[in-house]
Amino acid sequence: MFLRHVIVFSLIALLTGCAGLTSREAVQGKGDPAQWREHKQQLSSLDGWQINGKVGIRAPKDSGSGTLFWLQRQDYYDIRLSGPLGRGAARLTGRPGAVVLEVANQGRYEATSPESLLQDQLGWKLPVSHLVWWVRGLPAPDSKSNVTLDGDSRLASLEQDGWQVEYLSYVEQNGYWLPERVKLHGQDLDVTLVIKDWQPRKLGQ
């Protein structure tokens, strides 16, 4: 049970590098589309961050929560999980083409992508590479999306690839408005992310 939690928590919180902003989206809601485009452009320039927070997951036969540390440096990531997940901790590191998951007292698992690691270990298919975009409050650029804007021209909700993402609150950090509380709803799976500390970076300059 602990290993199942660890793999899901690790892969729900990640990353396969940052690309250009070319999402195909339908926009509705209260916000101004022009301000939304400016907001997207600003956030898309972030290619590094450090996050501290909490993550929870609920499935028909499985649920749990834990603390999250996520370091992103362009296409490299280091994600660590601990807390009330079980009797250990986990660390997920890698870059495109090479992913390593280390679980205390459980073992070491390798794959070429976070999606394939999740598929191999649990038999689940999740668009985990979208999270590098969703965590910044952006739709992933490689598939169609339906976007609803709030009154500040930021994401209120997002529908993409069978997932519904709700943005419950934002926080301002270093001039960037970034998600603070996010809920993700998929088929038979709900994920809640609460970010306690955002440290955004622009590394590619």
UniProtKB/Swiss-Prot annotation:
Membrane topology: Lipid-anchor
Gene3D superfamilies given in the database record: Lipoprotein localisation LolA/LolB/LppX
Keyword annotations of the record: Cell outer membrane, Chaperone, Lipoprotein, Membrane, Palmitate, Protein transport, Signal, Transport
Primary localisation category: membrane
Pfam families: LolB (PF03550)
Gene Ontology cellular component annotations, sorted alphabetically: cell outer membrane
GO BP term (any one): protein transport
Lipid-bearing positions (S-diacylglycerol cysteine): C18
Subcellular location: Cell outer membrane
Signal peptide: 1-17
InterPro entries: LolA/LolB/LppX, OM_lipoprot_LolB
Protein family: Belongs to the LolB family.
Subunit note: Monomer.
Name of this chain's protein: Outer-membrane lipoprotein LolB
Organism: Pseudomonas syringae pv. syringae (strain B728a)
Organism ancestry: Bacteria, Pseudomonadati, Pseudomonadota, Gammaproteobacteria, Pseudomonadales
